[in-house]
């Protein structure tokens, strides 16, 4: 009985100690914050802030800053947060994606960021910018970010560069304040984007690039992977092709969406007829070679791209690196599915027939057309391909994704047994398969 009471006393003492420590920590932090707010208010009352950002940084001691990053410290560890505080990141492009990168980097503990962008905050960009408000419209995007980030973490050094990044001034704009640990590409002009990626690659600087967020709306299709493995991203395809011409085949990590572009969702925004009638349409763009018409952007998507980029950076410098599936490029899986169709052809007595499908068509059929699951059972494991209608040749509109067991039944009853599709499958399955084939016929126009 005495031993039991002793353990109760020890437990109660431990809980009391934890509670007192937590309360003391909270009280100290609150007192520090209140003291600093009062000091700032007094400074304003004297006629505005006269101290430089460097001096202002010293108003906040390290323990106070660490408390503001408490959750990140607990998750990533003290060493990673310390390392992050010493990272120098250059973000090129301060729009929908870039502003979220800067915002989340600052909130995560990065203390030295250079932001390069020539553009101004527009009214139409407020739906996707990380911090811009109505009063910021018409002001440089980089200055907008600096002002708002100062309110969040005044100890962070934001270096705003209100210029267009070009290959000619790349050395100055990228390396002028020292060699960065990371370059983040959030540019939406293709040629400038390619130049920046080549610059980072040739200088051996870690880089991550945002691909196209326009006309995308499915967050479940967001991926991180090498540029060489992207799918269903027209911007990535063009950038990849241009970099190949410059001898860069891989080694550029990107954030991209594998969602198939669908004109039914979003189309290139038209230019008003009156602008065409005035002539010299190219002069309407902000700069030579920059876009005049644009694809519409769902406001939530750029933020996902930006936050993913920051998460990649955090993971890269920690002991918790990302292990992404390279988009949907599960080559071995798709090759196995492809071989399942070749094996079926041998089993039904036509081994010499060349399958008119490429390996890339397999990922397209599995992921895009049949949504990664069998139309019969809805199961998404042990998938194969099977010829559907025995009276028609194999094509993208006569191949169905089935499980291995379903493939065997289909072979025995339809392909070998000569039973009709209507006798083997109910109307619901037949309707769904027909719907998938119609969707493929539509999608194939844009492949």
Curated annotation (Swiss-Prot):
<comment type="similarity">
    <text>Belongs to the HesA/MoeB/ThiF family.</text>
</comment>
<dbReference type="GO" id="GO:0061504">
    <property type="term" value="P:cyclic threonylcarbamoyladenosine biosynthetic process"/>
</dbReference>
<dbReference type="Pfam" id="PF00899">
    <property type="entry name" value="ThiF"/>
</dbReference>
<keyword id="KW-0472">Membrane</keyword>
<dbReference type="InterPro" id="IPR035985">
    <property type="entry name" value="Ubiquitin-activating_enz"/>
</dbReference>
<keyword id="KW-0436">Ligase</keyword>
<keyword id="KW-1000">Mitochondrion outer membrane</keyword>
<feature type="transmembrane region" description="Helical; Name=1">
    <location>
        <begin position="9"/>
        <end position="29"/>
    </location>
</feature>
<dbReference type="GO" id="GO:0005739">
    <property type="term" value="C:mitochondrion"/>
</dbReference>
<keyword id="KW-1133">Transmembrane helix</keyword>
<keyword id="KW-0547">Nucleotide-binding</keyword>
<dbReference type="InterPro" id="IPR045886">
    <property type="entry name" value="ThiF/MoeB/HesA"/>
</dbReference>
<keyword id="KW-0496">Mitochondrion</keyword>
<keyword id="KW-0812">Transmembrane</keyword>
<protein>
    <recommendedName>
        <fullName>tRNA threonylcarbamoyladenosine dehydratase 2</fullName>
        <ecNumber>6.1.-.-</ecNumber>
    </recommendedName>
</protein>
<feature type="transmembrane region" description="Helical; Name=2">
    <location>
        <begin position="86"/>
        <end position="106"/>
    </location>
</feature>
<feature type="transmembrane region" description="Helical; Name=3">
    <location>
        <begin position="294"/>
        <end position="314"/>
    </location>
</feature>
<keyword id="KW-0067">ATP-binding</keyword>
<comment type="function">
    <text>Catalyzes the ATP-dependent dehydration of threonylcarbamoyladenosine at position 37 (t(6)A37) to form cyclic t(6)A37 (ct(6)A37) in tRNAs that read codons beginning with adenine.</text>
</comment>
<dbReference type="GO" id="GO:0005741">
    <property type="term" value="C:mitochondrial outer membrane"/>
</dbReference>
<dbReference type="GO" id="GO:0061503">
    <property type="term" value="F:tRNA threonylcarbamoyladenosine dehydratase"/>
</dbReference>
<dbReference type="InterPro" id="IPR000594">
    <property type="entry name" value="ThiF_NAD_FAD-bd"/>
</dbReference>
<dbReference type="GO" id="GO:0008641">
    <property type="term" value="F:ubiquitin-like modifier activating enzyme activity"/>
</dbReference>
<dbReference type="GO" id="GO:0005524">
    <property type="term" value="F:ATP binding"/>
</dbReference>
